[in-house]
């Protein structure tokens, strides 16, 4: 029996929402977070089941502990909340850069710190990175840097928190995600032609990989790409 909740940080949209839905459909208790309480509560109501929405802003790490205070035992923790956006060196936006680094590095670790007493020896953590760490593009310096930092985070957390398992997932282009689905067909085709499978990853593919990393008791300290062999 699973005694604890599944906590999805960044669970109000996109992949985080799909992960929350997956576990709710299987009767699990799910706590999903978003920056706006009303939106998080509305998504939780829409998804139904044993779901609850909370407000949590990763860019305000000193407030994270209080935001998570009402959560009990945790079986699985998914850290998927992130902002996108180009930030070129020529027009570097320091505020945007600090915000992104705070979210994905300081904020993620503070969530783990706040929930540490509620993790059991069989709990697991999944950290979302991304393939910009290996496939940079103009304006991706900060995104590529923090996604690379996720690898170091997983390495250290898996040692420090053992036997709690910690893994990361690095999706490529997820063709049916809200971010990519409305992009021009020629753009998606260019990415598709660069994969060894000849297909873009789907949200279902990422959810399947997520459950594998969260639930397989022998998988730990792994950084998994889900990108169809993007080259």
How would you label these PLM feature ranges?
Residues 90-91, 97-111, 121-162, 173-175:
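Catalytic loop of short-chain dehydrogenase/reductase
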Residues 171-194:
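A glycine/serine/threonine-rich, flexible loop-to-helix segment
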Residues 26-42:
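Conserved glycine-rich Rossmann-like NAD(P)H-binding loop of the short-chain dehydrogenase/reductase
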Residues 199-226:
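C-terminal substrate-recognition "lid" of short-chain dehydrogenase/reductases
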Residues 79-98, 180-183:
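Conserved mid-core segment of classical short-chain dehydrogenase/reductases
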Residues 46-62:
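Rossmann-fold cofactor-recognition segment
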Residues 78, 126-128, 166-169, 221:
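Hydrophobic structural elements of the Rossmann-like NAD(P)H-binding subdomain
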Residues 12, 20:
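N-terminal Rossmann NAD(P)H-binding glycine-rich loop of SDR-like oxidoreductase domains
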């Amino acid at each position: 029996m699973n005694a604890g909740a599944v906590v999805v940080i960044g669970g109000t949209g996109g992949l985080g929402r799909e992960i929350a839905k997956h576990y709710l459909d299987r009767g699990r208790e799910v706590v999903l977070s978003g920056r706006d309480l009303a939106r998080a509560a509305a998504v939780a109501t829409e998804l139904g089941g044993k779901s609850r929405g909370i407000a949590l802003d990763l860019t305000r790490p000193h407030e994270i502990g209080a935001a998570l205070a009402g959560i009990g035992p945790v079986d699985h923790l998914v850290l998927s909340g992130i902002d996108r956006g180009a930030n070129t060196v020529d027009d570097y936006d320091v505020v945007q850069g600090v915000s992104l680094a705070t979210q994905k590095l300081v904020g993620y670790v503070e969530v783990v710190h706040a929930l540490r007493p509620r993790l059991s020896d069989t709990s697991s953590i999944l950290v979302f990175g991304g393939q910009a760490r290996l496939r940079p593009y103009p304006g991706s310096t900060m995104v590529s840097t923090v996604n690379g930092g996720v690898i170091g985070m997983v390495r250290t957390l898996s040692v420090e928190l053992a036997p709690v398992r910690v893994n990361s997932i690095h999706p490529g282009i997820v063709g049916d995600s809200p971010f990519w689905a409305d992009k021009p067909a020629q753009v998606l085709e260019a990415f598709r032609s660069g994969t060894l499978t000849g297909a873009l990853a789907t949200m279902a593919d990422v959810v399947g990989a997520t459950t594998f990393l969260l639930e397989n008791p022998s998988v730990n300290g792994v950084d998994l790409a889900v990108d169809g062999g993007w080259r």
